[in-house]
UniProtKB/Swiss-Prot annotation:
Organism name: Pseudomonas putida (Arthrobacter siderocapsulatus)
Cofactor comment: Binds 2 Zn(2+) ions or 1 Zn(2+) and 1 Mn(2+) per subunit. The Zn(2+) in the metal 1 binding site can be replaced with Mn(2+); however, the second zinc in metal binding site 2 is much more tightly bound and cannot be replaced. The enzyme with one zinc and one manganese ion is more active than that with two zinc ions.
Record has Repeat as a keyword: no
Name of this protein: Creatinine amidohydrolase
Lineage of producing organism: Bacteria, Pseudomonadati, Pseudomonadota, Gammaproteobacteria, Pseudomonadales
Binding residue positions for Zn(2+) 2: H36, D45, E183
Pathway it works in: Amine and polyamine degradation; creatinine degradation
Reactions the enzyme catalyzes: creatinine + H2O = creatine
Binding, creatine: S78, Y121, W174, D175, H178
Impact reported for H178A: Loss of activity
Temperature dependence: Retains 75% of the activity after incubation at 75 degrees Celsius for 30 minutes.
Length: 260
């Protein structure tokens, strides 16, 4: 029998047996294909939540579904904007419908415990809408016990002491961390071959007005696409972030889905 935590690496009989046990937690990473500056690959928002899911699953005995590779449109003030070559996005209705369809299928399999791990800020409310529509559909079908936990891994990095270690020069806020120290450090810890620190563009933090304008003016986004400099990123910082996220998420899932 396969020992993999990835559903896609199991046979259907192995998967069926795990789900039939009744307390199996499934985890679904939801990412995006989005530029992350000159120094990192474009599938950061898929790679990172998938890696976190894998490590959490190994600690708690969960399974990881294949992640969603595409997400909602990159917004200028959180992801640099949807105008960059390579950034490939979904309409909100498409993402919502995909989440809804997957939940319905998992329920058909007999699963009742799901964790949706977001890796792309812009996905958030469309994931929630998909969950809401799916649970309503399941209730109409007589399924009342399907439970979903939705989270973003970065929300577990909140200890001021940890923030100080990551940003000793001062933390300017999550809203400009796209392609910055946080994501780059995690990538250095997990996928160092996909990071080239020599290509980091050291630029001042992006500044935006307290409102949005459409159509977007690309000139308001720093030229490399990152919203802050990643020059102080390091593998050590990434390892710290990873442990904080994995332990915090594992604890949260154990609390929400206690053993039966």
């Amino acid at each position: 029998m396969s020992k993999s935590v990835f559903v896609g690496e199991l046979t259907w009989k192995e998967y069926e047996a795990r789900v039939a046990a009744g307390d199996c937690v499934l985890m679904l990473p939801v990412g995006a294909l989005e530029q992350h500056g000159h120094h990192m690959c474009m599938n950061v928002d898929v790679l990172l939540p998938t890696a976190v899911c894998k490590r959490v699953a190994e600690r708690i005995g969960a399974l990881v579904m294949p992640g969603l590779q595409y997400g909602y449109k990159s917004q200028q003030k959180s992801g640099g904007g949807n105008h960059f070559p390579g950034t490939t996005s979904l309409d909100g209705a498409t993402l919502t419908g995909t989440v809804q369809d997957i939940i319905r299928e998992l329920a058909r399999h007999g699963a009742r415990r799901l964790v949706l791990m977001n890796g792309h800020y812009e996905n958030s409310m469309f994931i929630v809408e998909g969950i809401d529509l799916a649970l309503r559909e399941l209730r109409y079908a007589g399924i009342q016990d399907f439970k979903v936990v939705v989270l973003s891994y970065w929300d577990f990095v909140k200890d001021p002491a940890v923030i100080q270690q990551l940003y000793p020069e001062g933390f300017l806020g999550w809203d400009i961390e796209h392609g910055g120290v946080f994501e780059t450090s995690l990538m250095l810890a997990l996928y160092p071959d996909l990071v080239d620190l020599d290509r980091v563009v050291d630029h001042p933090p992006a500044t935006f007005p307290p409102y949005d304008v459409f159509p977007v003016d690309p000139a308001r986004t720093p030229a490399p696409g990152t919203l802050s400099s990643a020059k102080t990123a390091s593998r050590e910082k990434g390892e710290l972030i990873l442990e904080v996220c994995v332990q915090g998420i594992a604890d949260a899932i154990r609390e929400e889905f206690p053993p039966t």
